[in-house]
Amino acid sequence: MAQSVPPGDIQTQPGTKIVFNAPYDDKHTYHIKVINSSARRIGYGIKTTNMKRLGVDPPCGVLDPKEAVLLAVSCDAFAFGQEDTNNDRITVEWTNTPDGAAKQFRREWFQGDGMVRRKNLPIEYNP
C-alpha cells in the first residue's frame, strides 16, 4: 500500500517564499509551480493562514511522478500597515495516493494514518 512509503519530495518555484509588491489597493495574483519530483503519484492540498486575504487556485489536486501544476496565488486588496501580515504563509501538504486510486483528489487521503508532508512558503509584502 502506498501509505506505508513516506511521500517523496516536491519542488516549488519559487522555492522559499512568495513576494507581493505594493500598492495593495487592488487584487494581486502571483503564480507558483509545484512539481512532483518523486516516483509516486501524490495528492496535494494548499492551505493559507489568512483566508480573507489569500486564495489559491486550484486549492488541491493530484500529480503523477514528475508532473507539475501552476497555481494562482491571489492577494486581495487590504490596508497595508494596518493589518498584521507577519505570519502570512501558504502551506503545501502532500501525500502518496493509494495504489489503484483514480486520478481524482480525495480529502480523506489526508485524514487517515498515512504520512503527510508539508512545505511552508512565507509571504513577504514589499511596501
Curated annotation (Swiss-Prot):
Per the record, the major location class is other
**Which residues are recorded with the post-translational modification N-acetylalanine?**
2
What's the protein name?
A: Major sperm protein 19/31/40/45/50/51/53/59/61/65/81/113/142
Give the free-text miscellaneous remark of the entry: Around 30 MSP isoforms may exist in C.elegans.
Question: Which UniProt keywords are given for this protein, alphabetically ordered?
Answer: Acetylation, Cell projection, Cytoplasm, Cytoskeleton
Where can this protein be found? Cell projection, Pseudopodium; Cytoplasm, Cytoskeleton
Q: InterPro entries, alphabetically?
A: Ig-like_fold (IPR013783), MSP_dom (IPR000535), Nematode_MSP (IPR051155), PapD-like_sf (IPR008962)
The segment(s) forming the MSP domain are 9-126
Organism encoding this protein: Caenorhabditis elegans
Tissues of expression = Sperm.
**Name of the coding gene:** msp-19
